[in-house]
């Protein structure tokens, strides 16, 4: 994958997250802000999830209350470099824990 492909894939992922949050109908208020390729999700309890791209490594990083994760793109999805867990599944798990209700990204 070259840098251009990486940015296109990372942009698609960020846009999908934004669209999912914009259509979220749960009770929790989840705000998001994107600045310089870094997306920050802020929850009612003040906790945050940070998603950012690491261009030199062609990775997307996810920082949650439970820990940090690095994701590589393969076979149409982003997978954790340690556990093999898919990005949207891990994000759903972390967002649900931090929101106190089910938050599904796919």
Swiss-Prot record:
One Pfam family this sequence matches: Frataxin_Cyay
Quick one: a GO biological-process term for this protein?
iron-sulfur cluster assembly
Q: Which GO terms describe its cellular component?
A: cytosol
Its keywords, alphabetically, are:
Iron, Metal-binding
Superkingdom field: Bacteria
* GO MF entry, a single one: ferrous iron binding
InterPro entries, per database record? CyaY (IPR047584), Frataxin/CyaY (IPR002908), Frataxin/CyaY_sf (IPR036524), Frataxin_CS (IPR020895)
User: Does Transmembrane show up as a keyword for this record?
Assistant: no
Where does the secretion signal sit in this chain? none
Q: Does the keyword rRNA processing apply?
A: no
Q: What does this protein do?
A: Involved in iron-sulfur (Fe-S) cluster assembly. May act as a regulator of Fe-S biogenesis.
Checking PANTHER family in the record gives: FRATAXIN (PTHR16821), FRATAXIN, MITOCHONDRIAL (PTHR16821:SF2)
Which family is annotated?
Belongs to the frataxin family.
NCBIfam families per record = FeS_CyaY
**What is the protein name stated in its UniProt record?**
Iron-sulfur cluster assembly protein CyaY
Provenance organism: Yersinia pestis
